[in-house]
Amino acid sequence: MKEGGLRNKVAVIGSGSWGTAIANLLCKAGNETILWGRDENVIDEINNARVNSKYLPGVELFLRATCDLDYAVADASHVYIALPSFALSKVLPKLSLDKFSIVISLIKCLEPDTGRRMSEVISEALDLGHNRLAVISGPNLALEVANDEPSVSVVASANIATANIVAGTLKCPGFYCIPSSDIKGVEICAASKNLVALISGIARGMDLGDNTRAALITLGFRELLRLVLENGGTEETVFGVAGLGDVVATCNSHLSRNNKAGVLLAKGAPLDEVKQTAEGVVAISGVLALAERSGVYMPIAQALSQVISGKRTAHSLLDICFSLA
């Protein structure tokens, strides 16, 4: 634990792998941290056994947990949202925040069908100004962060002062934060990289070689770049840890759920099983909605959507990709 006493009361909403990992990190950084979740068994295990065996097995936890949402956010100066996107509409209206609380999104997707960024969804639901919103993204596989593997993340807010404040709460050995004002670019990278990872996983599931996978990742990354730049993001973000860095980690790690989902798609697994594996499968509609709204041509993403819906085979997806090379 960090010496020098507690610095902030921090709440993390969502007791899955990433929510638990970031809550434990915040606790190590010297913050008074409380984790909220719906599953009473998970919460009881965290409080009594100091582990979350369902989502983050083998990691010792130093935090408190609760199923009481009001208790979790009471007097919290920072509130981290680590929920699946589909759960936001149920949970956000129940949040009663301090008027100065900063809300930080850990969600790496766009709203399905609308393409809105998660910070936009949260801002509207909670009536928050830009100076009270931030996002965190980067190559941050939850288990590696929880095991204190050195990691770098981007903390982005339209207000750079807010990004710096949030980065300060996360400061601890082995976890490095880069403040950024490019919140649009960071969020779009986070969502779009899921598609690149799915394509990489499909190639892996088809037992294709590294040459093929590298080409597919590059072509998918090219679409990500166009989408980010057309929507006001920067090249610095795309080629930094929130863009390229996250793509590298997600496409190559056995811990990546989107990578695993791509493997399942290639092997013809039922769609329900694929959806349960990774939110990126569901959220592809958000990326395509944003692309349509901003006039960005994304043929690979469109073909991937057809593979997911069963209208196209994985082999035909490869044909489309290589026709664009």
Curated annotation (Swiss-Prot):
Keywords: Cytoplasm, Lipid biosynthesis, Lipid metabolism, NAD, NADP, Nucleotide-binding, Oxidoreductase, Phospholipid biosynthesis, Phospholipid metabolism. It catalyses: sn-glycerol 3-phosphate + NAD(+) = dihydroxyacetone phosphate + NADH + H(+); sn-glycerol 3-phosphate + NADP(+) = dihydroxyacetone phosphate + NADPH + H(+). GO terms for biological process: carbohydrate metabolic process; glycerol-3-phosphate biosynthetic process; glycerol-3-phosphate catabolic process; glycerophospholipid metabolic process; phospholipid biosynthetic process. The active site is at residue 193. Gene3D superfamilies: N-(1-d-carboxylethyl)-l-norvaline Dehydrogenase, domain 2, NAD(P)-binding Rossmann-like Domain. GO terms for molecular function: glycerol-3-phosphate dehydrogenase [NAD(P)+] activity; NAD binding. It comes from the Bacteria. Pathway: Membrane lipid metabolism; glycerophospholipid metabolism. Sn-glycerol 3-phosphate binds at residues 108, 138, 193, 246, 256-258. It is found in: Cytoplasm. Coiled coil: none annotated. Its EC number is 1.1.1.94. NADPH binds at residues 17-18, 38, 108, 142, 257, 279. It is an enzyme of class 1 (oxidoreductase). InterPro entries: 6-PGluconate_DH-like_C_sf, 6PGD_dom2, G3P_DH_NAD-dep, G3P_DH_NAD-dep_C, G3P_DH_NAD-dep_N, NAD(P)-bd_dom_sf. GO terms for cellular component: cytosol. PROSITE patterns: NAD_G3PDH. Pfam families: NAD_Gly3P_dh_C, NAD_Gly3P_dh_N. NCBIfam families: PRK00094.1-2, PRK00094.1-4. Catalyzes the reduction of the glycolytic intermediate dihydroxyacetone phosphate (DHAP) to sn-glycerol 3-phosphate (G3P), the key precursor for phospholipid synthesis. Belongs to the NAD-dependent glycerol-3-phosphate dehydrogenase family. This is Glycerol-3-phosphate dehydrogenase [NAD(P)+]. It comes from Tropheryma whipplei (strain TW08/27) (Whipple's bacillus).
